[in-house]
Every structure is written in C-alpha cells, then in structure tokens.
Regions:
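ABC transporter nucleotide-binding domains
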Residues: 2-6, 11-210
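ABC transporter nucleotide-binding domain
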Residues: 175-266
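Generic beta-strand hydrophobic packing signal
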Residues: 9, 27, 254-256, 288
C-alpha cells in the first residue's frame, strides 16, 4: 500500500488583479513505504503546494490525494498521529529550553514524557536540551523541529527544505539524520529539497516536478541509469598524446582532474571503436568505462524548459 498517492491533483491560485497562477497541474505521484523519497523541482514547480495539499493546509481544485489509502484532507483527523511534518521554520519559545518546548508539545499531544528524551537523542540534541532555544543555531532549531515532528512516532515524516539556510556542517548533520530516519524500518521520509547533492546522497527514490507535473519518478539509480550520457572515462599511459588523437578523430575530450583521474570523452557511440582506434596508434587503454549521469544532469535536462 502506498504511503502517499496523488492522482490528477491540481491547484490554481487566484488573486485579485493578477492572472491565475497554476501551481499544480494534473500531478500523479506514488510514494511507497520505507526509506527516503526525494521530491525535486525548480522554484515554483509545485513542491510546497503539493505538501500543503497533503497536510490539509490548502485544498486541491481537482484530483484526489491519499495518505495510507485514506482520502485527505477528510481523513487527516484520524491520521494525524501517523504523520509528522516540518514545512516551515519551526517556532519555539525562545526563552525556554529545547527540552521544555518539547515537553509542552508532548503534553498537548498526549505523548508520554519519556518520548522527549528519545527524540532528543534521535536528532542529536540530548546534550544541548537544557540550553535556551534562543541560543540554538539554525541547524539546531531545524533538528528540534524534526524532534517535535517525531514525538508521535509517525509512519510518515514530511520535510520541506530542512537544510535551507544551514552552513556546511549543519547540512552534513541534517543529511546524516535523514539517512538514519529512513533506515529505521518504520518511518517513510518524504524529502522536498532543491539541493540535488543532498537528495542523491540520502534518497532511495526520487520524483522530479516541472510546471506542476511529474516528469520522472523511480529509484534514484534507475532514474540515473535511464539517462545515459554517452560519455566514457579512459585511462592511458600517455593521456596528452591520446587526447590529441581523439580530438583529431572528432571527439570532445576533457580532463577529469589530475593525471591519475583519466579523461572524459563525450558522446561516444561505439566505445569498442574508440579503443581500436587508439590501439592501432600504440595507445593502449587501462580503463574504458561508461560515465553515468548524475542527478544534477538529469534534473537540468528534464526541467530546462520549466525554469
């Protein structure tokens, strides 16, 4: 059973004196249970609007949205304990400690006090839980927000740009946390992000939006494999001499780093023919390997007309 299922969802915003803005346009989306599912798209592609529709914050104009096979927003009151979310910058009492903020949330949610320590440990804030929130870094506040979202032991955790504004150290901590949460065997993490490297490193599945529609969805490795670059990496004893020969044969060749990293040969239709051509001229390859597309390349290719 899918955790999230969206069929033909549409949302148009209408503002007085301005043209209608179609944020989501016939979106189909399926998120199976388990792991981390990345949700990507350019600014204005409908990611946040989709999340807001799933959480009942805005209503769809058309289509159907389901969580755990229940139609939302109607079923949200019954599902609320199964869903945790961090959609905007979390708000806490700044002069209270991190622990006290969570204790108050636990009381209102009917959660046992012992759960507070559990979620603080999960997000790595147990040793800072007695500090006032006003002294927390942005990354710590984001992690405290995730701790709050985890209080009810949700089966689905929805995160909208959790790494926004974080410094490099904070981003590393957030990636590690998301990876752990997705690996716990109980929680499905639905991660909306514009950070392609983050998604490629932590996600098992990915969906890419453009102009409010899904343009590709699947396992990250399968999505990348489906977009072959046609480029190959070659290693050879005489890289400069080989480069001259390949360029004379009409290939575009770029360096992949230092002399030990090899050369990238672009748009190779027949790698065996490239190998034969070099061998006939006394340049024998120690490596000839296809270069898979990375998520950034796939993303830019699929969304280039939507940016």
């Amino acid at each position: 059973m899918p955790v999230i299922e969206v069929r033909g969802a549409a949302k148009t915003y209408r503002r007085r004196g301005k043209p209608a803005e179609k944020a989501v346009d016939g979106l189909d989306l399926v998120v199976e249970g388990g792991g981390v599912h990345g949700f990507l798209g350019p600014n204005g592609s409908g990611k946040t609007t989709t999340i807001r529709m799933l959480l009942g914050m805005v209503r769809a104009n058309a289509g159907e949205l389901r969580l755990f096979d229940r139609v939302v927003p109607d079923a949200l009151p019954e599902l609320i304990g199964d869903i945790g979310a961090l959609v905007e910058t979390p708000l806490f009492f700044p002069t209270f400690t991190g622990r006290r903020n969570l204790e108050l949330l636990a009381i209102t949610a009917g959660v046992a006090p012992a759960r507070v320590d559990e979620v603080l440990a999960t997000v790595g804030l147990l040793d800072r839980s007695s500090d006032h929130v006003k002294g927390y870094s942005l990354g710590m506040k984001q992690r405290l927000g995730i701790a709050a979202a985890l209080l009810k032991k949700p089966r689905l955790l929805i995160l909208d740009e959790p790494s926004n504004g974080l410094d490099p150290a904070g981003m590393v901590e957030m990636r590690e946390l998301i990876r752990r949460l997705g690996a716990d065997g109980r929680t499905t993490v639905f991660l909306s992000s514009h950070l392609l490297g983050e998604v490629e490193q932590v996600c098992d599945h990915v969906t890419i939006l453009a102009r409010g529609r899904c343009v590709v969805s699947g396992r990250v490795d399968e999505v990348l494999a489906s977009r072959e670059t046609g480029d190959v990496r070659v290693r050879v004893a005489d890289p400069e001499g080989s480069r001259v020969l390949m360029e004379q044969a009409g290939f575009t060749v770029t360096s992949m780093g230092d002399a030990h990293s090899g050369l990238r040969v672009h748009g190779v239709d027949d790698p065996a023919e490239l190998n034969r051509m070099l061998a006939e001229r006394g340049h024998y390859l120690s490596e000839l390997a296809p270069i898979a597309a990375d998520l950034e390349t796939v993303f830019l290719d699929l969304t280039k007309d939507a940016s």
